[in-house]
């Protein structure tokens, strides 16, 4: 619900929402966003960020929806966001929990947890795209919030970079799926790996494309295990003449 007496212009720049709310005594303002909702492997990561009063000065003008930026740019902005943040948190929801509750419920749960883990309860919460209740304070859903509200954009960066780092770490355990490349999202290469090896513990078994490969025959299981061992042993080895 839009707060009474607060005029928020979408053309006021990335910091327009925070400035308007703080002027009306509704600060500090937390932005919340997630990463990994559309993936079929790996966790969902939800972040909450409260920018400090000098956030506008300390943050690069490149701050925008993390999905529009390169991985290298996001990594640099991640450090900038943490320096500019008065408070922040990140919540990691594993694939098993997503399978139990569904990704939408997991997303809402993650948003509530992220706000609850902030050091101080915010005066207002801005969410990206859809309304969420249960923060213990007022909130507002902002359409395309990660492109128009700085605190949501900052949360998007924290969530995306945190999840990318997790997926790169998982790649060292499951090299055959190439998680470092596609980060658990559906690609032709990922689909081919699923068909060949079946899902691993980090795949979301409730997803249709994963479930299709979730119950291989005993013979196929044996072959896929051999493939995994071979892929792991050859990872990083370059054939020479």
Swiss-Prot record:
Entry's localization field: Cytoplasm
GO molecular function annotation: manganese ion binding; RNA binding; RNA-DNA hybrid ribonuclease activity
Keywords associated with the record: Cytoplasm, Endonuclease, Hydrolase, Manganese, Metal-binding, Nuclease
SUPFAM superfamilies with a match to the protein in the record: Ribonuclease H-like
Binding site for a divalent metal cation: 33-34, 128
Any Pfam family: RNase_HII
EC number(s) reported in the record: 3.1.26.4
Primary location group: cytoplasm
Ranges for domain RNase H type-2: 27-227
InterPro entries (alphabetical): RNase_HII, RNase_HII/HIII, RNase_HII/HIII_dom, RNaseH-like_sf, RNaseH_sf
Catalysed reactions, as listed in the record: Endonucleolytic cleavage to 5'-phosphomonoester
Swiss-Prot/TrEMBL cofactor(s): Mn(2+); Mg(2+)
Highest rank taxon of the organism: Bacteria
Cofactor note: Manganese or magnesium. Binds 1 divalent metal ion per monomer in the absence of substrate. May bind a second metal ion after substrate binding.
Gene Ontology CC annotations of this record: cytoplasm; ribonuclease H2 complex
Biological process per Gene Ontology, one example term: mismatch repair
Functional note: Endonuclease that specifically degrades the RNA of RNA-DNA hybrids.
Family indicated by similarity: Belongs to the RNase HII family.
Protein name: Ribonuclease HII
Organism: Frankia alni (strain DSM 45986 / CECT 9034 / ACN14a)
Annotated gene: rnhB
